[in-house]
Swiss-Prot record:
Gene: glmU
Keywords: Acyltransferase, Cell shape, Cell wall biogenesis/degradation, Cytoplasm, Magnesium, Metal-binding, Multifunctional enzyme, Nucleotidyltransferase, Peptidoglycan synthesis, Repeat, Transferase
Positions of the UniProt region annotated as Linker: 227-247
UniProt: acetyl-CoA binding residues: 377, 383-384, 402, 420, 437
Pathway linked to the protein: Nucleotide-sugar biosynthesis; UDP-N-acetyl-alpha-D-glucosamine biosynthesis; N-acetyl-alpha-D-glucosamine 1-phosphate from alpha-D-glucosamine 6-phosphate (route II): step 2/2; Nucleotide-sugar biosynthesis; UDP-N-acetyl-alpha-D-glucosamine biosynthesis; UDP-N-acetyl-alpha-D-glucosamine from N-acetyl-alpha-D-glucosamine 1-phosphate: step 1/1; Bacterial outer membrane biogenesis; LPS lipid A biosynthesis
Subunit composition and interactions: Homotrimer.
SS bond list: none
Subcellular location(s) per record: Cytoplasm
GO MF, one annotated term: UDP-N-acetylglucosamine diphosphorylase activity
Protein name: Bifunctional protein GlmU
Amino acid sequence: MALNVVILAAGKGTRMRSDLPKVLHPIAHKSMVQHVIDTAHEVGSDAIQLVYGYGADKLQAKLGEQQLNWVLQAEQLGTGHAVAQANDNISDDDTVLILYGDVPLIQASTLESLLAVRDENGLAILTVNLPNPMGYGRIVREDNKVVGIVEQKDANAEQLAISEINTGIMAAPGKQLKAWLGQLSSDNAQGEYYLTDIVAMAHKDGVAITTAQPESAVEVEGANNRVQLAQLERAYQARAAEKLMLEGANLRDPARIDIRGDVSVGMDVMIDVNVVIEGTVNIGNNVTIGAGAILIDCDIADNAEIKPYSIVENAKVGVKASAGPFARLRPGAELAEDAHIGNFVEMKKALLGKGSKAGHLAYIGDATIGCGVNIGAGTITCNYDGANKFQTIIEDNVFVGSDTQLVAPITIGKGATLGAGSTITKDVAADELVITRVKQRHISGWARPVKKAK
């Protein structure tokens, strides 16, 4: 049987008080519905039906390049009505997994468990026991077998006392699901077509109904307002922080890290507070990440150190290399083994070779710098003429004095020395000393201008 996933994402989310469709609000820098789509792929979906309604243009602008079947729900008439819109894309022999675009923390392992407990032609529903089930549909059992689901507004006093609730997530056989959806009625307190009514239909038809539960109730929580969205964000971050610690990272405070992507860590990694990690980040063994650092799509090798308040984006930091504090590695920057940049040094599309250093207050762009090079404070590679960018090449063991400008394209030969305050516009040969400063003048008897009275 093919696994056909239906994701319900048509709601406006009025309580969000936003023009953005509810499912596009982010958790960890990724829309809620994208989390669900990614999880659907993780469980091996053969097809994904995205049922949409409000904010169609924004949804398609955000998700349009993905392999999705777009199914319009023109009127929001309930969950059963929403799933029914996808009937034309469901084959009789499909296993249909129904998910929700505003329930972003559902785990692939939980869905795999749900699919595993389902009989070949049976119905499997994901339930959870809550100490306070207020507002949720209750699972009705007879002799411990599920016979139906009753919504909060339609429940009697006995049913309201039930703590096992419906999460809405279920797996059903395609042929029977389409038949059940065709029998739904809106004769209820909400005047909607409840997907939950198919459970009673399945029981009546003698179809086996099985249940599974998530490892944690937070997996099945949705976000209807920004308070709930923030609560899900915290839950996501707590889970991500726990994963890092289990992989070998020491987090100075697990509640003060922001993980917005996929991060892998080696052993004995130390991460201080208020670090932000985005995209795909790989951190080696014995790495130290200082407070307030931002890591985006980067690789940090063994024994490296990113000091406080530094930014590393689309860059590489080599073994025993260090950056910061307050350093910035922009896209294409690379620190080789044991290289170092200090405070207020910025690099872009540049390589700083093994053992080389730029201690402070420098800009290095479109440059290749060899081994053992010293870049003095205030040094700038002048790589842009207003129209095009040019390369600076600095060979091994060069000493660049403070406040030096290197006007590209230019090559500085091995072992050369550039005097402080120089503006270098021509290539420098190996082992040369170059100084371009204006000759110092001494003017005796100089008097400063007197300020005019106001």
